[in-house]
Amino acid sequence: MLKIGCHLSASKGFKNMGEEAISIGGNTFQFFTRNPRGSKAKTIDETDIKEFLKLAEENNFSKILGHAPYTLNACSADENTRNFAVEIMKDDLERMEYIPNNLYNFHPGSHVKQGVEIGIKYISDMLNTVLKPEQTTTVLLETMAGKGTEIGRTFDELKEILNNVELSHKVGVCLDTCHVHDAGYDIVNNLDKVVEQFDKIIGLDKLCAIHLNDSMNPFGSHKDRHQKIGEGSIGLEGIKNIINHPMLCNLPFFLETPNELDGYAREIKLLKSIYQN
């Protein structure tokens, strides 16, 4: 069974997101844990949570994915920005425990000319501050395209962060297909090699989710502009190979390129039609 969903608005609660996911043929979804620009999160509605968990169990949902706000920059040169990232993630992870055993994704951040090593240290320090032994949520580092001074453009950078995290079993990776394509990993012509590289450097046991996005940009452009499935430089054949790869096919896939629900429904129907496992 293809584990597939898209990014949905959390404004009407978890049960509503679950119902929307089902209505478009999905069995999971991604959501922002708060406004993507980082304002205060909504109050937890425990009745809504309870109803969603029942709905998810009845409909055999895969793990859902909470996405941290874009403003979270754990490796900023500004100490206040780094402290803000710690507080946001700490609060988000406490809230994620209302929906236990799920996933929480964040962009590692930009080191802003401090250097990669300092950036990696700050990110690791944040994770060592916020992670708790008793948490059930797995925190995911997202692969990045390499715009500016972004950390996470290479598998080696992500591995170095993981190596410095004390509770490393609480941390994994979310692979964004647009980002790795734009970062210079040839998932179109040499997907097997890229998967082998990931396994050798990080380990496939750490790969927990995939952001399934096509790319507006040429290979290795370091641009990060998503395109709808089959309409970009990865192409439908490239996407088909990804969702059917034996080492990737059982992971949850999340569509992120902005779309209407009807558009996501069409993409999910298309993906199901080319899914062969």
Swiss-Prot record:
This is Probable endonuclease 4. GO terms for molecular function: deoxyribonuclease IV (phage-T4-induced) activity; DNA binding; DNA-(apurinic or apyrimidinic site) endonuclease activity; phosphoric diester hydrolase activity; zinc ion binding. GO terms for biological process: base-excision repair. Belongs to the AP endonuclease 2 family. It comes from Clostridium beijerinckii (strain ATCC 51743 / NCIMB 8052). Zn(2+) 2 binds at E142, D176, H211, E256. The lineage of its organism: Bacteria, Bacillati, Bacillota, Clostridia, Eubacteriales. Zn(2+) 3 binds at H179, D224, H226. PANTHER family: APURINIC-APYRIMIDINIC ENDONUCLEASE, ENDONUCLEASE IV ENDODEOXYRIBONUCLEASE IV. It catalyses: Endonucleolytic cleavage to 5'-phosphooligonucleotide end-products. Its cofactor is Zn(2+). Endonuclease IV plays a role in DNA repair. It cleaves phosphodiester bonds at apurinic or apyrimidinic (AP) sites, generating a 3'-hydroxyl group and a 5'-terminal sugar phosphate.
